[in-house]
């Protein structure tokens, strides 16, 4: 049995609470969430790292160094605070141990480049992804060449746009040239122009929305609503990586996505204007 170490900004959040059971369901006793470190108590619920460990059956580590030493593989969480990833990754990515870094990987391209440069310097296998990459509707995509995409999904740009942006860029398979942002209190839309002249839009609604796309191709238009168990598929791929499988997402793809994300953050400051990626 390989022992997983959780490293989080605060542990009482949906990913840390859900992953242990998902991992057990996927691979049984091949992997176990054995150790955990949380930098602070949850600012939402007040639960401390010690209380979380007592609830979920993990051993509390007082430092990241202690956790990295004891663990076989590492999982850096902080899914709602991607600005913490660079700090939380400093010791794990020097360890050489397989490391998964939860979504969203980084706030912008320079941060993402520094994180991956550290991993490459020390030979640490690692990757990051949106679970939506593994939605059956996208993985099994077959169509004539794509000419344009309109994508919709829930919640605000900062935390949830990765779940639309990553599968969109995976399907189009082309770098983004520039972006334009518009929005109001409960919604936003990002226009994306790709370097080959194709276009896409990405819209988020704070009130909630299914993950869906309308995809135009040279043959026909398709509406795709994600209904598959994409989180289960993501966990299966994560476990395979921890058990010795290949890195699941090339660093170059993630860096391209983070470049777009950083450009949109700049575009939010000047709505209605194109910003180069």
What spans do the regions from the language model cover?
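N-terminal Rossmann-like dinucleotide-binding module
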Residues: 1-53
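Conserved acidic residues
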Residues: 34, 72, 147
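C-terminal helix-rich "cap/oligomerization" subdomain common to oxidoreductases
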Residues: 51-55, 66, 70-80, 241-277
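Beta-loop-alpha module in the N-terminal Rossmann-like domain of NAD(P)-dependent dehydrogenases
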Residues: 55-116
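Glycine-centered short loops/turns at secondary-structure junctions
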Residues: 96, 123, 271-272
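A contiguous active-site-proximal alpha/beta segment in oxidoreductase catalytic domains
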Residues: 100, 105-161
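Rossmann-like dinucleotide-binding domain that binds NAD(P)(H)
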Residues: 147-210, 252-259
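Interdomain hinge/lid region at the active-site interface
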Residues: 208-246
């Amino acid at each position: 049995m390989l022992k997983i170490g959780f490293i989080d900004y605060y542990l009482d959040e949906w990913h840390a609470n859900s992953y242990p059971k998902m991992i057990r369901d996927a691979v049984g006793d091949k992997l176990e969430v054995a150790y955990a470190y949380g930098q602070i108590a949850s600012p939402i619920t007040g639960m401390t790292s010690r209380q979380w460990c007592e609830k979920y059956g993990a051993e509390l580590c007082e430092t990241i160094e202690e956790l990295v030493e004891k663990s076989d593989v590492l999982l850096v969480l902080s899914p709602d605070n991607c600005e913490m990833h660079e700090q939380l990754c400093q010791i794990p990515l020097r360890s050489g141990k397989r490391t998964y870094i939860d979504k969203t990987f980084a706030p912008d391209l320079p941060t993402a480049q520094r994180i991956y440069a550290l991993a490459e310097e020390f030979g640490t296998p690692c990757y990051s992804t949106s679970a939506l990459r593994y939605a059956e509707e996208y993985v099994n995509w077959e169509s004539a060449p794509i000419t344009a995409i309109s994508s919709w999904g829930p919640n605000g740009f900062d935390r949830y746009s990765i779940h639309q942006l990553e599968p969109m860029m995976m399907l189009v398979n082309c770098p983004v040239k520039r972006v334009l942002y518009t929005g109001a209190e409960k919604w936003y839309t990002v226009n994306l122009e790709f370097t080959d002249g194709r276009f896409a839009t990405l819209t988020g609604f704070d009130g909630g929305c299914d993950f869906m796309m309308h995809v135009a191709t040279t043959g026909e238009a398709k509406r795709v609503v994600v209904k598959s168990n994409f989180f289960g598929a993501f966990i299966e791929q994560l476990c395979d990586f921890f058990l010795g499988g290949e890195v699941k997402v090339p660093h170059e793809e993630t860096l391209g996505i983070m470049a777009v994300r950083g450009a949109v953050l700049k575009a939010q400051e000047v709505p209605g204007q194109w910003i180069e990626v």
